From Swiss-Prot:
PANTHER family: MIP31509P (PTHR40626), ZINC FINGER PROTEIN YPR022C (PTHR40626:SF11). GO terms for cellular component: chromatin; nucleus. It comes from Schizosaccharomyces pombe (strain 972 / ATCC 24843) (Fission yeast). It comes from the Eukaryota. The keyword Disulfide bond does not apply. This is Hydrogen peroxide stress regulator 1.
Length: 582
């Protein structure tokens, strides 16, 4: 590209300015015309060069004028909008007049053409009859006004020499600075980093040192015209074919060396595998030999023969007794089985005391037959009926569990009627609807059994009679309420819940007083206790006033009361609640 001095006139035309290629007889018909670079702030087009086919139109060959080029109807989009101060029929020239220089003639020239409607009327009343206006650059005289055209008035031609600030801004660009420096120092034209080496840029050689800034000759290093698309299909909304930066990046990617990964073996090496040899005639140790190596056992015998087999287990084979214990609140139970002919039963144990079951059973039977006969010693009269899991051995040898309700420990059996709806007395054949009524009838009339005893020594066959008797002692002396509280039968929190009875103290005079006390406090307490009578001696006179006095051997089982401890009163809940029936 070549820019000219600042004295270069400004052409202000209406509508749009279309740059063209000068096709003189001394220049090739096609040439490469680079567009301005993006480094100039006046342009918004990319810096990719484009070549356009031009059609020659000879207008005036007598004056040796350069042929005119037909107008290509495309616009250059300026990055700066026109100033509002300019006339409505004046358009800014945002493209330098010398941006498109074609050919390598001895006399370089710059031409431009405009597309103007013939009926356009200017402010001075003149009209533009010709569609093209040409301006020629002479050899040494620089720019001169174009020859007068009949269609353009003198005042209109004078506008070409009027300077404009917009044009000065355009000339003061980096390309103008490059031209001045290139003419003096023979510098190459600046190229964008995205341009290709095959683009037809020119460079100047300063061969004549004259006073002008215009180089005397132009040398092209590539005069071959590049292929350009059809001008009718040019769209300056650039497509991907006209984006040099993407092409440049693609070239860089293609220039990258190929990375070859190391080939790893994809096949698994074959390791030798030896098939195990099988000999059907090989000697296999017989079952007799294997059994003979076992330790001697009375339940196992070996008989010799062609097919040696072990004899079946005898039906009568003594096994050691198994002793198992449950949790802390369960009692131990020992089961001795003399003989078995099936699997080993599975049992669970409840709060019953130690029981001893002896007998034998066959497969298909249960342990309930041998657990019915138990020792009833040590059970409280009002204990709830316990539940026991019994292991049942089926005919197929599998273990089956079922729950059965263990009968309460009663000394008197309660027979049922044949229908099972009533209870019949075995002595008088009297029927009762409830078992406790029948049991009470037998104890009071037939056996005269009195299992309920008071601390005073009196016995009762019914528990409710005992409670009525105890209330007499409590009403006479409230201090005796703690002795008749049924702590062995009920807990203090939930009535009806059985608790374990506490171990009685053997001697009331043995009072522990040395726990958590100093030596001085222990001496004072001993002196105070020595001056007082034992608690058992204080209780006896009060009870002796009643006909049924407490026997001396029962006093040793009374709880202990310290001198500073108050006597607890009977809980009203315990005093008036009904007790469980016998």
């Amino acid at each position: 590209m070549v820019f000219f001095p600042e004295a270069m006139p400004l052409v202000t035309l209406s509508e749009r300015m279309v740059p063209q290629v000068n096709t003189s007889p001394f220049a090739p018909a096609q040439s490469s015309s680079p567009l301005p670079s993006n480094s100039c702030r006046e342009y918004s087009l990319p810096s990719h060069p484009s070549t356009h086919n031009s059609s020659v139109a000879y207008v005036d060959s007598q004056d040796n004028k350069p042929p005119l080029v037909s107008t290509l109807h495309f616009s250059l989009a300026p990055s700066l909008s026109p100033s509002s101060a300019q006339s409505h029929n004046t358009a800014l020239i945002t493209e330098p007049l010398t941006s498109f220089i074609g050919g390598t003639s001895q006399y370089p020239s710059a031409s431009f053409s405009t597309s103007q409607h013939p009926s356009q009327v200017y402010n001075d009343g003149s009209t533009l009859n010709s569609n093209n206006t040409t301006q020629q650059l002479n050899n040494n005289n620089g720019f001169q006004p174009p020859p007068q055209n009949p269609g353009i008035s003198k005042s209109r031609i004078a506008q070409y020499h009027q300077p404009s600030q917009t044009y000065d801004d355009t000339v003061d660009s980096s390309f103008y600075d490059w031209y001045k420096a290139g003419a003096q120092h023979n510098l190459a034209p600046p190229q964008s980093s995205h341009t290709e080496a095959s683009q037809g840029y020119m460079y100047s050689t300063n061969t004549a040192h004259d006073a002008t800034d215009i180089p005397s000759s132009f040398n092209f290093y590539n005069t071959q015209a590049s292929t350009a698309p059809n001008p009718q299909e040019i769209n300056y909304q650039w497509s991907h074919e006209y984006r040099p930066h993407t092409q440049y990046q693609n070239n860089l990617l293609r220039a990258q060396p190929n990375v070859n990964c190391e080939n790893f073996p994809t096949t698994v090496p074959n390791y030798p595998f030896q098939q195990p040899s099988y000999n059907p005639n090989a000697l296999v140790p017989s079952y007799t030999t294997l059994v003979s190596q076992l330790p001697p056992s009375p339940c196992l015998t070996v008989s010799s023969g062609p097919l040696s087999t072990a004899s079946s287990i005898p039906s009568n084979c003594s096994c050691p007794s198994v002793k198992s214990s449950g949790p802390s609140y369960h009692a131990e139970q020992e089961v001795n089985v003399n003989s078995y002919n099936g699997g080993i039963p599975s049992t669970s144990y409840n709060d019953t005391p130690q029981q001893s079951v002896t007998g034998s059973y066959n497969s298909g039977e249960t342990m309930s037959t041998y657990l019915n006969q138990t020792n009833t010693s040590g059970r409280s009269p009002n204990s709830m009926e316990a539940t026991e899991q019994i292991g049942t051995i089926g005919t197929d040898g599998s273990m089956k569990r079922r729950k059965r309700r263990q009968p309460s420990n009663r000394k008197t059996s309660v027979p049922r009627s044949p229908g099972g709806k009533s209870f019949v007395c075995p002595e008088c054949s009297k029927k009762f609807k409830r078992s406790e009524h029948l049991r009470r009838h037998i104890r009071s009339l037939h056996t005269s059994e009195k299992p309920f005893v008071c601390i005073c020594g009196k016995r009762f066959s019914r528990r409710d009679n005992l409670r009525q008797h105890e209330r007499l002692h409590v009403n006479a002396s409230p201090r005796l309420a703690c002795f008749f509280q049924p702590s062995g039968y009920y807990s203090s929190g939930a009535p009806g819940a059985p608790v374990q009875p506490q171990k009685p103290i053997e001697d009331l005079n043995k009072i522990p007083i040395n726990q958590g006390m100093d030596s001085s406090q222990i001496e004072n307490t001993n002196l105070m206790l020595s001056s007082q009578r034992p608690l058992s001696q204080q209780i006896v006179p009060e009870i002796a006033a009643y006909p049924n006095s407490i026997r001396p051997e029962l006093l040793s089982k009374l709880p202990v009361q310290t001198p500073n401890q108050k006597m607890p009163l009977m809980n009203p809940m315990h005093q008036y609640q009904p007790y469980p029936s016998s």
